[in-house]
Design a protein with these regions (language model features):
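Beta/coil-rich, acidic/histidine-enriched accessory regions frequently appended to metallopeptidases
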Residues: 142-236
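Short, solvent-exposed positions on alpha-helices
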Residues: 36, 40, 119-127, 164
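Loop/turn elements at helix/coil->beta-strand transitions in domains of secreted/extracellular proteins
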Residues: 21-24, 53-54, 121-125, 161-162
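Catalytic cores of extracellular degradative/oxidative enzymes
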Residues: 1-110
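Non-catalytic carbohydrate-binding regions of carbohydrate-active enzymes
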Residues: 76-149, 155, 171
Length: 236
């Protein structure tokens, strides 16, 4: 607790924990706290604060963590997310690790909030989504509908069709699972509901980058400035 109570220690060890708990206060129920997100959407605040004060040590990209194959490596969370989520297609709500589940939300934060010279810069997008949720009566909606609403709200706020991104990270896919998130609750999304959201979002242009789901803090400059890819195919 010392690093939380001492201002001189807070920047080094207490930032995440403080923002984590305040993040719980800002988890608007139910629209920003549907099943599987109890320890995820609150950490959006933690990851942003940690990056603000330690941009050279982004937590998800540098922390020693499980890579999904039983190996503990720096940046293991992102490796786990990219392998199981993007490549293998695992459903996002079924990711067991809350930090792995945080990765795509962090990617959206990086793309829209942390790239100030980009034409798509919308630093307040998450706050705008929260404001929509705050002023919308979502009482009685299923958890699947809440997840769909979140994706719809993000598309509305940024003015772009992010359905390909949400599909690749495992959020916009059919699911019918009983999930344990401080108690068991069903999360159901049908193929028809996925198709309906894709049709709705098609009114917006696609993001300039078609591969936001590969973005990390390490590649932010390349995305922001749309730099050409360097290296040799198959060699790196």
């Amino acid at each position: 607790m010392w690093d939380l109570a001492d201002p001189d220690q807070t920047h080094d060890g207490g930032l995440w924990a403080i923002a984590h708990e305040l993040g719980h206060v800002n988890q608007i129920v139910p629209g920003l706290k549907w099943v599987s997100t109890a320890e995820v959407t609150n950490n959006v605040y933690s990851i942003c604060l940690q990056y603000k004060y330690h941009p050279d040590e982004p937590l998800l990209e540098t922390s020693q963590s499980d890579d999904g194959n039983g190996e503990s490596i720096p940046g293991g969370c992102f490796n786990h997310f990219l392998t199981s989520g993007v490549v293998e297609g695992k459903l996002w709500p079924l990711q067991e690790d809350a930090f792995v589940k945080l990765c795509p939300l962090w990617q959206l934060m990086l793309y829209y909030r942390m790239a100030p010279t980009a034409s798509w810069y919308k630093p307040d997008w998450y706050g705008d989504v929260a404001e929509i949720v705050r002023n919308t009566d979502e009482t009685g909606m299923s958890h699947g509908q809440l997840q769909l609403n979140f994706m719809r709200n993000v598309c509305d706020v940024v003015g772009e069709d992010l359905t390909e991104f949400f599909s690749k990270v495992g959020m916009l896919k059919p699911i019918n699972e009983r999930i344990d998130d401080y108690g068991y609750t069903w999360l159901t999304i049908t193929q028809d509901e996925c198709d309906e959201l894709k049709k709705y979002a098609s009114q917006y242009p696609k993001p300039i980058s078609p591969v936001v789901y590969y973005l990390t803090a390490n590649s932010l400059e390349a995305f922001e400035k749309q730099l050409p890819v360097k290296g040799m195919y198959g060699a790196g």
